[in-house]
């Protein structure tokens, strides 16, 4: 009987303590990825922004801004560099993709994007964070890329035409 009483007390204590938990505020993990293998002048570059809410409440009024790509060096082909997402529920994610086209070749420093959000419905002040930083990347000239990766059809046709006389004899 004494063991039965101890088990009942432990169960009542466990039930009483689990009901008092507060929901943790929203906390966003933010990453920025460049999806292209080669960065080429005049060709599209795909950039993916991923947000994941690891908190216990929804993140509200999420604003993503990336000031890395100036209009003098890059043209925005698809998507937007400044985006607002109304809410990201707890345990879920949101992604955004931007397609840009570089107008110059050379080395370029891809810096972090910025996110700001309200961690709960009652928060008065927005939290500000930064994404992961892809770092420095080389944008190669289109001529160099074309020289390496073009199918060289004209070269193969001229080779075939020059080797035909020796095969016919």
Model regions: which residues?
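Acidic, serine/threonine- and proline-rich intrinsically disordered appendage/tail regions
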Residues: 2-9, 17-31, 39, 123-169
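Short acidic/polar inter-strand loop motif in beta-rich domains
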Residues: 105, 117-124
């Amino acid at each position: 009987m004494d063991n039965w009483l101890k088990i009942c007390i432990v169960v009542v204590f466990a039930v009483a303590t689990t009901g008092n938990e507060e929901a943790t505020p929203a906390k966003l993990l933010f990453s920025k990825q460049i999806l292209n293998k080669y960065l080429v002048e005049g060709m599209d570059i795909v950039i993916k922004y991923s947000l994941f809410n690891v908190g216990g409440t929804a993140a509200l009024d999420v604003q993503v801004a990336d000031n890395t790509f100036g209009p003098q060096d890059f043209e925005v082909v698809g998507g937007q560099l400044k985006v607002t997402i109304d809410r990201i529920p707890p345990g879920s994610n949101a992604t955004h993709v931007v397609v840009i086209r570089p107008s110059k070749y050379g080395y370029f420093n891809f810096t972090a994007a910025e996110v700001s959000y309200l961690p709960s419905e009652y928060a008065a002040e927005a939290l500000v964070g930064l994404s992961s930083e892809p770092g420095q990347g080389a944008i190669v000239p289109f001529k160099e890329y074309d020289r390496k990766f073009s199918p060289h059809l004209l070269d193969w046709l001229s080779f075939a035409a020059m080797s035909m006389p020796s095969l016919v004899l």
